[in-house]
Amino acid sequence: MSEMAKKIRVTETALRDAHQSLIATRMTTEEMLPILDKLDKIGYYSLECWGGATYDACLRFLNEDPWARLRTIREHCPNTKLQMLFRGQNMLGYRHYADDCVEYLVQRSVANGIDIIRIFDALNDIKNLKTAINAAKRENGKAEAQVAISYTTGPVFTDEYYVEYAKRIADAGADSICIKDMAALLTPTATESLVKAIKSAVDLPIQLHTHYTSGLASMCLLKGVEAGADGIDTAISPLALGTSHAPTESMVAAFAGTPYDTGLDIKQLAEIRAYFMTLREKYFKNGLLDQKMLATDAKALIYQVPGGMLSNLLSQLKQAGKEDKLTEVLEEVPRVRKDAGYPPLVTPTSQIVGTQAVFNVITGERYKMCTNEFKGLVAGEYGTTPMPIDPAFQKKICGDKKIICLLYTSPSPRDRSVSR
């Protein structure tokens, strides 16, 4: 290995985002238990295993205690960092919560075994991140505050935009930064450019997270690492591809013997693969895993719809007996997103924009019916949108509803002033 060699950190997503992306977060703690001890011996930088939709799914669908799950994983994985996804001021929910709730959830998450808290805001609004970051920092080094940039494309979303946001993240006290490409919109060239730009501006480790929906994830991870990324998110191969992530084994093999060698053992990973392959077959048989979720769909680059959002849209249309309208809805999503100030499509904005697009199509008239959540998004209840919303549109949607945020008028995050 050369003098410039650096071991690339690998975060395994099999226990959280992989199954959230493929089977709607339905993997049970009982299904995880038999493989936990072996996962702990692989040498992963971290195991993403909690937060995101897991809390909701445990309570709503699996009849499980999410805290008991976390403690169980901690007990069986004493040597590997455990990681969670935290929605900033939305915590693990779908609306804003009070600061003391955010602080307490961070504290209890760390107390129950979390080492890395990946914090993001759907609008890339730094104000919605500061409480969670500060709470993590108060844990006296017990938790890494990793802040995620919600990546998307659109008129305002240039490398300069993301660099300025990364600087604000660093100023807020983050320990590391994650480029979170939830909708698989990154291309290899864009990844290389963005990683280089952020690394040149901010002295923090960079983790790269992208999905396989558009078929570009492996190439993006390769170019990102070559450009200076310090870590990557992957999924063990039976739970990889499609709306999930690049396969762990493939990326380990790609970097083996290079200056970016991960240090992970392919033979050990084969044992992990064998176990999850049995679960994969089980999910096919019981209908949890649909073959469509494993397909590559380059239309993701056009419609900018994350995989989980796609399955949710189809479900809504089926319930309305309008599944033949899926293409129209997918075409409507970017238009709704533009009207709403170009929010990145990630929880909760993906659900809000997607549901409104469904309403616009099935009613036959745009914005004839609006959800309360969409009204709240346009009114600023979720934070400041990346681009200004037309005041006339705001009035049409919100009526007499109080506008909470004065929307930004400059594309540079550092130049924007906000009144609440």
Predicted segments, located by residue:
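Conserved small/polar residues in nucleotide/adenosyl-binding loops
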Residues: 408-415
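Active-site-adjacent beta->alpha loops and helix N-cap segments on the catalytic face
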Residues: 62-67, 122-139, 156-159, 184-198, ...
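Alpha-helix-loop-beta-strand connector modules within alpha/beta enzyme cores
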Residues: 60-84, 133-147, 192-208, 257-258
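Conserved, mostly hydrophobic/aromatic
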Residues: 18, 119, 177, 228
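N-terminal small/glycine-rich loop or linker at the start of catalytic domains
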Residues: 3-25, 78-94, 141-153
